[in-house]
């Protein structure tokens, strides 16, 4: 009976030591790996360079499939893991990671030209011919812009960028100019409830 009691006490003390050892290893491991990947830095911990803008398209030169890549520099004294797994402390001058930014698919149709054609020559359908809608352009030409009312409606639709080029691309708009962005509501959209008075 005494033998069982002693072996039970040894087992308990060994179990306690093993648990303490496991806990210490877990704490040391978690303290050593608190550095995240560089692409998971929070806003304010990095600064992304401005993309190089193509003069012809007014979009980033690296734009492909509506996405462009820019280089991001972590702030000074920020430590993070590079893509190859090494930990690095940045001085603010080194590139830490690349980030994607949205860009637009353009194919040569200028917004300024489309609005000017719609305003001055919309009554003969020049705007619709320019945007690639020859049937509507011919119809506007034959009806003198639907007696002016169609020209006014087309001018409003083109200036609000509702009517765009026929190939589905976007207008060429100055990169830092006034661009319209369509907002949509989906099932993931958060709606804040208004307090009732």
UniProtKB/Swiss-Prot annotation:
What residue stretches are annotated with the TM2 domain?
A: 108-155
Membrane topology field: Multi-pass membrane protein
- Extracellular side of the membrane: what ranges? 33-105, 165-197
Q: Where is the signal peptide?
A: 1-32
Q: What is its main location?
A: membrane
- Could you name the domain of life of the organism this protein comes from? Eukaryota
Q: What are the record keywords, sorted?
A: Glycoprotein, Membrane, Signal, Transmembrane, Transmembrane helix
Q: Which residues form a coiled coil?
A: none
Membrane-spanning intervals of the chain:
106-126, 144-164
Q: Which residues are glycosylated?
A: 77, 84, 98, 105, 187
Report the InterPro entries cross-referenced here. Answer: TM2, TM2D1-3-like
Where found?
Membrane
Q: Which GO terms describe its cellular component?
A: membrane
The residues on the Cytoplasmic side of the membrane are 127-143
Q: What protein family is recorded? A: Belongs to the TM2 family.
Q: What's the name of the protein?
A: TM2 domain-containing protein 1
